[in-house]
C-alpha cells in the first residue's frame, strides 16, 4: 500500500483547475504501487488515477515515461493514457512534487498466476514490445548488467548478514554474468518490471492492461521476457514451473516470435534478471530502518531464483 | 489509510459467487477508515465498497450497523446501502473475517471545513436523526458517560506521562460530568463519530453522504450534535470557531429544531464529548507499540478541547 502524500480537498481543487476535467466527484487514496502515491479520482469527465511521484523515480525521467504512455495509447496498447493539462503538459506538480493524471484502467491483477494467465501475460508483453517500436524517447537501463557489480559492492555486508558465504557466491555469479552476458540481441523499449501486480486481466482471464512503467528503459526485449519468467513462473516453494514458462513464451511468440539467438540467451538473461532483483531487494533490505512503514521485499526469494538459474534452464527442448 | 487484510483475486471471485453482482472488473484497496479494510470493487453490476471488519468492531454488532444502513437507505438517506448475498444476508465473511459489500457513494470529504460546510454537515446530521427514527435495532453507547471513569482508571498513568498533573484534572472533570450529565434528553439512533472524514460533499459544497456508522448507538441526539461541534468547529490552533458552530447548529435546525433543554445541555454535552474522544485516544496512545503501522491520534488535541469546554461555551445568546 502506498499513500505517502496527503492531498486536501482544497489542494485537489486547485490542482484540477489546470485540467479540463470538470469538478471532482470522488477521490480516494489507493493501495497500488510501492514507489508513488496513487489516488482514484472521479470527475465530471470520467475516472482517472492521480499519481504523485515520490522517491526513486527521477523527475527528469518523467517525460520519458509519460510520453511513452501517450505513445503506447496512441497505438492502441492498453496502458493508461496521460491526461494533458490545459496547456498541453502531461507532467504537472502537486504539493511541490511531480504529479500526473492518467486514465483509469479496469482489470484485476492475479496473485497466483495460472499457466493460462502466463500465456496472456506473455502475449501482452510482446504486444508492448511491438507497440513501443519507434518510440523516440531514450533511457539507459540504470539497473542493467553493468550496474550490478558496483551495486553489490555497496551491500556485500548485508548479503553476508542474510546468509554467511553468500557474498562469494554472488561475486562468482557476477563474474560469470559479465563473461557470458549477451550483447547482440534485438533491443528496444522494455517494461523491465512486468510483475503480476503490474498486469491487469479481464474477468474472463484475458489480458487487459499493463501499468507502472516507471522502470521502463532501453534494453534487450528478451531480457524483459526473462524478468517476466522470473516474476510469473516460480512456485511459492521456489521451484520453477516449466509449464507456466512455456505458456508464457508461447503467448509471447503469438505476437513476436523470438529469434534463435534470443532463445539461446534466455537462460543467462533469466539468471541476470534474478541477480538484478536480488541486488535491489538487498539494497532496500539494508537501507530500511527497523519499524519503517514499508516492509522491504525478501532478497532471499530472488537468491533462491538465482540458485535455480545457476543450474541452467532448459526452456526449448 | 487502512488495508489490513490482503484479498487475492481467487478469494474475491469465490466471495463474489455469493452475490448477484456479476464478475469483478476492478478491485483496489483504499485508504479510508482506520478500523477496517476497505476495497473499491467494480463489477458488471456497478461500483461498491467491500469492507472486511477488523479490530474494535464487534461481530455481534454488525447486524445492527448493516440493518441500520439498509433502514436509512430505504428512507432516502444518503448512506451506503448494503448489498445482500444471494441468500439475502447483508453480513458475509471473507478470510474468516466478517465482511460486507455496500454501495459506492460519490463525494469528497473536506479537510478544513468552512462555515458553509458546517451548515451542510449540520443539516445532514439532523436528516440522519430523523431518518433513523423508528429503527428497531438497539445498541447501548458503550463509550457513553457511564464508561468514562472506568476507562480512565486503566489509563491514568498514560495521562500523567503525557502531561504531569493531568490525571487530577481529568478526575475533576469526570466528577463534574457525572454530576451535571443530562439524562432527560430526546434520544434515538445517533452516528456518534460524525467527523469530517465521515461526511462527503458534492463538488458544489452541498452535503452528499455520511459513511462509517460503526460507532452508531442509542443516545441523546444533542450528544451527537456535541460530538460534531467538537469535530468540525475547532481551529488548528485549538480555538473554538463560534461562527462555524452557529452555522452547524443553524443547518441542523433547518431539519430538526433543538428543544430548549437540548440547547441548554449542549455545553456540558460538548465537554463530555471531548472527554470521550480524549479517553479513547489516550487508550490507543498507551496501547500502540512503538513502530506500529498505524499512528495513534494525539490525545492532547482533545485535552485542549476539554480545556475550552471547561470554561463553558455560549452557543445561544
UniProtKB/Swiss-Prot annotation, chains A, B:
It is an enzyme of class 2 (transferase). CDD domains: HomoserineK_II. Pathway: Amino-acid biosynthesis; L-threonine biosynthesis; L-threonine from L-aspartate: step 4/5. Pfam families: APH. Keywords: Amino-acid biosynthesis, ATP-binding, Kinase, Nucleotide-binding, Threonine biosynthesis, Transferase. This is Homoserine kinase. Belongs to the pseudomonas-type ThrB family.
Amino acid at each position: 500500500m502506498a499513500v505517502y502524500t496527503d492531498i486536501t480537498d482544497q489542494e485537489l481543487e486547485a490542482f484540477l483547475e489546470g485540467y479540463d476535467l470538470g469538478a471532482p466527484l470522488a477521490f480516494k487514496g489507493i493501495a497500488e504501487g510501492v514507489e508513488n502515491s496513487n489516488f482514484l479520482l472521479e470527475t465530471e469527465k470520467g475516472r482517472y488515477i492521480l499519481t504523485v511521484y515520490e522517491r526513486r523515480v527521477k523527475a527528469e525521467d518523467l517525460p520519458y515515461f509519460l510520453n511513452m504512455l501517450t505513445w503506447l495509447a496512441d497505438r492502441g496498447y492498453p496502458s493508461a493514457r496521460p491526461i494533458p493539462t490545459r496547456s498541453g503538459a502531461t507532467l504537472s506538480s502537486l504539493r511541490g512534487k511531480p504529479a500526473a493524471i492518467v486514465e483509469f484502467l479496469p482489470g484485476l491483477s492475479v496473485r497466483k498466476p495460472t499457466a493460462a494467465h502466463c500465456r496472456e501475460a506473455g502475449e501482452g508483453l510482446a504486444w508492448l514490445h511491438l507497440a513501443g517500436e519507434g518510440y523516440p524517447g531514450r533511457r539507459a537501463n540504470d539497473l542493467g548488467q553493468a550496474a550490478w557489480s558496483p551495486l553489490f559492492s555497496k551491500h556485500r555486508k548485508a548479503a553476508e548478514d542474510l546468509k554467511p558465504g553468500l557474498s562469494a557466491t554472488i561475486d562468482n555469479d557476477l563474474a560469470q554474468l559479465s563473461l557470458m552476458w549477451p550483447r547482440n540481441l534485438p533491443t528496444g523499449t522494455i517494461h523491465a518490471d512486468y510483475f503480476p501486480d503490474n498486469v491487469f486481466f479481464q474477468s474472463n482471464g484475458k489480458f487487459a492492461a499493463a501499468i507502472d512503467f516507471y522502470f521502463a528503459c532501453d534494453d534487450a526485449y528478451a531480457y524483459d521476457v526473462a524478468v517476466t519468467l522470473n516474476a510469473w513462473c516460480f512456485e511459492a516453494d521456489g521451484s520453477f514451473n516449466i509449464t507456466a514458462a512455456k505458456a508464457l513464451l508461447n503467448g509471447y511468440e503469438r505476437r513476436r516470435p523470438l529469434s534463435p539467438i534470443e532463445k539461446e540467451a534466455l537462460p543467462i538473461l533469466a539468471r541476470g534478471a534474478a541477480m538484478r532483483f536480488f541486488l535491489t531487494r538487498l539494497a532496500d533490505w539494508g537501507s530500511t530502518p527497523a519499524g519503517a512503514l514499508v516492509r522491504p521485499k525478501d532478497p532471499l526469494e530472488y537468491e533462491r531464483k538465482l540458485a535455480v538459474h545457476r543450474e541452467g534452464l532448459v526452456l526449448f527442448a
